[in-house]
């Protein structure tokens, strides 16, 4: 495995990329007696722990930014990182704020689902690395 501490990188983590994966997860949860709300909370908490662990391992000072889609997931990641406040420092596009962690240069962009176009992610990445 390559050492990601020595190379620039982009990492994408998602709970599911396709609708079929969501349905499969819901089916397994139902078989285990877990309802959709509890399943969602488990996934959000797990992603929060995983992302915060990865960010800490890479080093906050080595990252130019973090893009988070989904408000609950973003909140879980920020909580697990132990950050108290995020400051709004700009807007990438309507409804998509650019945030900065107090006392660091780390930037976050958070996007709720259901809006944006095929260029939204490109604009986000550009703002995070610039």
Question: Which residues make up each language-model segment?
Answer:
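Active-site catalytic microenvironments in core metabolic enzymes, especially phosphate/sugar-handling
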Residues: 1-130
